[in-house]
Amino acid sequence: DFPVMKTAIEVHFTPSYMFFPIHNSRMQKWFKEVMDLQCSNVVTLPDGYGEITVPTTPFNVVYVLSHLYRHVFTEGIGLRQLLDYYFVVMMWHTDLTNLTDSDSADLAALQWELKRLGLWKFAGAVMYVLHEVFGLEEDMMIVPMNEKEGMFLLDEIMRGGNFGQYDDRLGDKTGEGKVHRYFRMSLRNMRFVRHYPSEALCEPLFRTWFWTWKKLNVTK
């Protein structure tokens, strides 16, 4: 983060990433494939404030979901993040005004991409939460909802709250040091192994590698 005109700016070198190397490699390749389209998607701001480039809705359907997925393993997510995704899904379907053959192909392509990136099971869990909490109709879902995984995800959300700030199952996080936080997060992710084994097992390894990389490459 760094300030620009007194506004905090968070810069990412990639939109998102996965902890499992194979899925992460596929995701980074996909980002490169669609990058030009995202950078050329210009929208006009209201009241004459100019133009900006924004990601397309088909991109956000995948990107925001992957962002939610990553936060499940790095502290937790709250209903406010799920509400954001509800509107992304609704916008995606609004763009597909009629379920024509072309639109069916778009849905099939999206579902194939979610499977390839390792997001299929989590997407089904999210659809269940969006249905139970926000009333998302089944015909508006991007994948069939997964009730079992969805109930587990909703329980995690309700126990932990936004970014897991209310999750005290592994003790009080107030004033914890880096070492304590490392082991707490690693232990926390073990409860996800049965549901999302590749990401849950790779997250501590990724975190260790990234910490080492920063120590060796980032200058102060």
Predicted regions and their residues:
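Conserved NTP-donor binding/palm subdomain of two-metal-ion nucleotidyltransferases/polymerases, i.e.
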Residues: D1-K220
